[in-house]
């Protein structure tokens, strides 16, 4: 099968077909180009997505620690590598497929143009030979007709008796001339015809088949090139499949690395404050002052003793406690015992069972009208708030447990830096010894400035370590003391109630007097206690805010930098001081945020 023999007369068709082949090649090249743009945009969008969800971290504290977060960031890293492989696909297609197609299309256009020009030239040469043969043929035909006319004229004159001999001779000469010219044109025509037949045979059996064969080979090479580009298009994708598979395997491994128990433990390590939960509230017996005995002589005495006891045990307690519900405490009474409800004593000391309706009625009223005294645990999150203000050097703005961890981390970092400086000092000393033994290697004095700087760094780091260790010891000792103090309070069931700090810690002061309401006669009206206000505590000093404090949490007092407040209760060791504004608003503020000045007659109270 050859175009030269099968399609010898289809020059125009082959012209159109080869042009279509080049157009198809360029169309496929355009397709590859658009695919490359898609891959590039896809990779760019993936990288932007990774950059959006994996921002740069400014410090180590912001690095992800939870296994779910670490797994997500590992997935983002794998996705970033996956985006890189999409870029590799685009680059491979651009180099191996698109670039090769464009170069080959340019070469095809040049080669096709050359072959078509050769075919047209061969056709033009054959047409020229045909015209020469046709002209000689027409000239031979014309000379033959002229010779026939000359012969007819000669015969007519020769048969005419009236014609002169000269006319006959002239006609004969004219006939001979025309006959000679006809013979010459005949020979010319025969030569041109033979030449044309030869050129035509050469054209259709040699020249055109050769040109068409070259066009056929060109078109077949175009088809082969398309096949190679198809394969290269797929190979560009197949080459990155192993790496993409590794990226996907990395994502699967990241998913398997998620440990929910470890994350839960990290939550505990991150937010554990170190405080202990508040202890149980002691039972407050408000019914003992209304107990009566059968003897009339003991009624008034019991009232007086009860009144004295209540007045003594309740004096000033309202000042020392931040009431969670904003109400004045009910009168304090000795603990209620089962025998006090049902027994009475006679003057001679004998006891007998009795049933009093009044205490039961009072207890029922307490159950129906009394509000639950539940401490607020929202304040326990005081030390976890990220809005506390600027971080302090000793981390006193953090809860004890978090403060201990931060200090321990800083001590570990300082120890590592100290070890580096110590190693550098040892290296400098060794180098100095080498220089002293071999002066030609260097000047020992040149190492003295660096050695002095290293020693200064070591001293500075040791001081920092000592300072942080002192803070750490303070935190550990304070946490242990607070637990012992709360345990002692729970065992002794002190009637005095501890002050609740904003963190939820309690500070019990057994030496503080407790003030109760005035002695009332008749039935006790529980609604009076609901709406009475506490007397304001006296100021024991004043303070000035060093840092601003928002005071969003319950029981705290917001303050601005430079604001002056009254001190109404000192820091009991939990890092909080109770203060009051001039408008009477009270609350707790961080002790490390204020500059405290106490009155001389109030210090130590």
Curated annotation (Swiss-Prot):
Residues 541-597 are annotated as: Interaction with DNM2 and WASL. Keywords: Autophagy, Cell membrane, Coiled coil, Cytoplasm, Cytoplasmic vesicle, Cytoskeleton, Endocytosis, Lipid-binding, Membrane, Phosphoprotein, SH3 domain. Residues 541-605 are annotated as: Interaction with DAAM1, DIAPH1 and DIAPH2. Residues 397-474 form the REM-1 domain. Transmembrane segments: none annotated. InterPro entries: AH/BAR_dom_sf, F_BAR, FCH_dom, FNBP1L_F-BAR, FNBP1L_SH3, HR1_rho-bd, SH3-like_dom_sf, SH3_domain. GO terms for cellular component: cell cortex; cytoplasm; cytoplasmic vesicle; cytoskeleton; cytosol; intracellular membrane-bounded organelle; plasma membrane. Residues 527-536 have a biased composition (Acidic residues). The record marks 165 as: Mediates end-to-end attachment of dimers. One of its GO terms (biological process) is cilium assembly. Residues 245-535 are annotated as: Interaction with CDC42. Residues 476-539 are annotated as: Disordered. The keyword Cell membrane applies. GO terms for molecular function: cadherin binding; GTPase binding; lipid binding. Residues 538-599 form the SH3 domain. Residues 476-490 have a biased composition (Basic and acidic residues). The modification Phosphoserine is found at residues 295, 488, 501, 505. Residues 522-605 are annotated as: Interaction with DNM1. Residues 66-258, 392-484 form a coiled coil. It comes from the Eukaryota. It is a peripheral membrane protein. Gene3D superfamilies: 6.10.140.470, Arfaptin homology (AH) domain/BAR domain (1.20.1270.60), SH3 Domains (2.30.30.40). Belongs to the FNBP1 family. Homodimerizes, the dimers can polymerize end-to-end to form filamentous structures. Interacts with GTP-bound CDC42. Interacts with DAAM1, DIAPH1, DIAPH2, DNM1, DNM2 and WASL/N-WASP. Interacts with ATG3. Interacts (via SH3 domain) with ABI1, WASF2, CDC42 and WIPF1. The F-BAR domain binds the phospholipid membrane with its concave surface. The end-to-end polymerization of dimers of these domains provides a curved surface that fits best membranes with around 600 A diameter, and may drive tubulation. This is Formin-binding protein 1-like. The lineage of its organism: Eukaryota, Metazoa, Chordata, Craniata, Vertebrata.
């Amino acid at each position: 099968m050859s175009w030269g023999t099968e399609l010898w007369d289809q020059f125009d068709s082959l012209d159109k077909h080869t042009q279509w082949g080049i157009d198809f090649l360029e169309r496929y090249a355009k397709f590859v180009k658009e695919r490359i743009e898609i891959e590039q945009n896809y990779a760019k969008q993936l990288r932007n997505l990774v950059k959006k969800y994996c921002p740069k971290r400014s410090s180590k504290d912001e690095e992800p620690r939870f296994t779910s977060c670490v797994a997500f960031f590992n997935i983002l890293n794998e996705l970033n590598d996956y985006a890189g492989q999409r870029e590799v696909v685009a680059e491979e297609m651009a180099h191996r497929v698109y670039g090769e197609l464009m170069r080959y299309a340019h070469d095809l256009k040049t080669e096709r143009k050359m072959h078509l020009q050769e075919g047209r030239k061969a056709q033009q040469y054959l047409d020229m030979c045909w015209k020469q043969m046709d002209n000689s043929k027409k000239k031979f035909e014309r000379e033959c007709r002229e010779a026939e006319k000359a012969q007819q004229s000669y015969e007519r004159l020769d048969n005419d008796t009236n014609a002169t001999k000269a006319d006959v001779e002239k006609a004969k000469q004219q006939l001979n001339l025309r006959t000679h010219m006809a013979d010459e044109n005949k020979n010319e025509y025969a030569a041109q015809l033979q030449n044309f037949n030869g050129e035509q045979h050469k054209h259709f059996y040699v020249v055109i088949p050769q040109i068409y064969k070259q066009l056929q080979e060109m078109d077949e090479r175009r088809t082969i090139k398309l096949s190679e580009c198809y394969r290269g298009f797929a190979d560009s994708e197949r080459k990155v499949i192993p790496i993409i598979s590794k990226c996907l395997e990395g994502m699967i491994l990241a998913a398997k690395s998620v440990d929910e128990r470890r994350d839960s433990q990290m939550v505990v390590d991150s937010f554990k404050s170190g405080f202990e939960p508040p202890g149980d509230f002691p039972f407050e017996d408000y019914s003992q002052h209304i107990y009566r005995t059968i003897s009339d002589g003991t009624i008034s005495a019991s009232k007086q003793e009860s009144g004295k006891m209540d007045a003594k045990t309740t004096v000033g307690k309202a000042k020392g406690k931040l009431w969670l519900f904003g109400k004045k405490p009910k009168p304090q009474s000795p603990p209620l015992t089962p025998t006090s409800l049902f027994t009475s004593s006679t003057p001679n000391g004998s006891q007998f069972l009795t049933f009093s309706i009044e205490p039961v009625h009072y207890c029922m009223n307490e159950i129906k009208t009394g509000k639950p005294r539940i401490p607020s645990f929202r304040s326990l999150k005081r030390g976890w708030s990220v809005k506390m203000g600027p971080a302090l050097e000793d981390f006193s703005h953090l809860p004890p447990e978090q403060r201990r961890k931060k200090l321990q981390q800083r001590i570990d970092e300082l120890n590592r830096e100290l070890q580096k400086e110590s190693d550098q000092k040892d290296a400098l000393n060794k180098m100095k010894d080498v220089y002293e033994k071999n002066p030609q290697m260097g000047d020992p004095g040149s190492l003295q400035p660096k050695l002095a700087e290293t020693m200064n760094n070591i001293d500075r780091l040791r001081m920092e370590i000592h300072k942080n260790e002192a803070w750490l010891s303070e935190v550990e000792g304070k946490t242990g003391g607070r637990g012992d103090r709360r345990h002692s309070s729970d065992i002794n069931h002190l009637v005095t109630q501890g002050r609740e700090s904003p963190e939820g810690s309690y500070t019990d002061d057994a030496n503080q007097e407790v003030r109760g309401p005035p002695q009332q006669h008749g039935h006790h009206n529980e609604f009076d206690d609901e709406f009475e206000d506490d007397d304001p505590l006296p100021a024991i000093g004043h303070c000035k805010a060093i840092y601003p404090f928002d005071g969003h949490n319950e029981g705290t007092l917001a303050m601005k930098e430079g604001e002056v407040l009254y001190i109404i209760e000192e820091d009991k060791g939990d890092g909080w001081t109770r203060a009051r504004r001039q408008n009477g608003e009270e609350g707790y503020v961080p002790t490390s945020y204020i500059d405290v000045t106490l009155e001389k007659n109030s210090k130590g109270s």
